[in-house]
Amino acid sequence: MQVGMQMRGGLTRIFGAALVAAAFAFGGTAPAAADGKMHIAFGDIATVESLNFLIAIERTKERGVDVEVTFFKSEDVAAQAVVGGQADIGVGTPYALIQKVKAPVRLFYQMSALRFFPIVNTEFYKSWKDLDGQEIAVHSRGSGTEAIMKLMAQKNGITYSNISYVPGSEVRAGALLQGNVKASIVDSTGKNMLEAKAPGKFLVLPMEGVNATDEALYANTEFLKAQAPAVEILVEELLKTWREINANPKVVADLRKKYNLLSDLPPELEGEVVPYYEGAVATKAFPSDGGGEAAVKDDFGFYALAGQIEGDPASLKVEDFWTFEPLQKALAKVGAQ
C-alpha cells in the first residue's frame, strides 16, 4: 500500500476557488488504468475509522483486481489527483467540484452518512443560543462538520464569532477535555471518551434534520466505463463488507487480524476498534444499499443549506452528480436490502 503525505483529514470537503483553479490546471484528463487495475486516492491517513474500507479493498484484491491506495494529506488533494488523472477513484463528497468545474466526475457509492455530535463544555454553554457570538472548532474548511455547525447556527438564529479548524475528531475531543476548546463537534468515539473521562462536564446539543453523506466514492466517468467489471467487484465487496459489519460490528477486529491491517496501531487504539464500529452501526452510519436517489436528494438539501451547493435543491439533477450503474449491477448480484 503506497502512502503519500499524511495528515488527519477525514472529512475535508471540496470547496473554494483555489481548488477550482487547480482542477482546471489539471485539465480533467481521464485516467489510463490498466485492465483490472485501480488507484484509489484517500484524503486521510489509515485509521480505525477506515478499517471497513481497507477490508473491502483486501477482498477486492482477492478477486483479482489490482488495487493501489495512496493516502494524501487532505481530500481536496485527493480530488485533484482524480480530476488530473493521477488516481482513478477518490473518497469524499466533491459536490462543489462537480458543480463549479463541471468536471467529468461522478459519485457512485455512498460509504457513510454524517453521524456527529455537537458538544459543549457545560461550564460555559448549555444550549445553541449560548453559542451566539462564541467560537467553535470543526474539522476543516468546507467539511461535513463545518456544514453541520453552520446549518445548526441558521436553524437556531445565531452567529459564531469564529470557526477554528482542528483536524481529527480525537484531537478536538482532547482539546475539549483539556479546556483549549469549549464548543466543537466530534464522532461517537470522541463523545464516548468525553463522557467516560469527564462525566457531566460536557453536553451534546440537540441536532435534528441532518441526514447527508459523509464519505462516498467518485471517479472519472471514462474510468467507470473502461473499468466497469473491476468497479463492480469493488462495489460488491463494499456491500458485502458493510452488511457483515452491520450484522456484527465485532467482526472488524477479526478481519483486521486476518488481513494484517494497521499492524502498527498503538495498543491504546486497538481497544477502540470494536466500540467505534458498534457506535457507528448503532447510528446507522454505514448504509447497506450503497445509497440511492433519496440519499442524494438529502445531500442536496443539506449541502445547499450549508452553502456548499448552489441553487434550489429541488431543481438539482441527481444525474449531474451521481451515476448508479455500478451500484445497480452489484445489487443485482448480491441482492438488495
Predicted ranges, named:
Residues Q2-A18:
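Bacterial N-terminal signal peptides that target proteins for export
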Residues F15-G27:
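Bacterial N-terminal signal peptides
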Residues G28-A34:
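Sec/Tat signal peptide C-region and signal peptidase I cleavage site
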Residues A34-P167, A173-Q178, K182-S188, F202-L205, ...:
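Short, glycine-/small- and polar/acidic-enriched structural segments
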Residues R63-V65, N156, K197, Y259, ...:
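Residues at alpha-helix termini
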Residues P94-Y95, V171-D264:
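Pocket-lining segment of extracytoplasmic ligand-binding domains
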Residues A226-E310:
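Secondary-structure end/capping motifs
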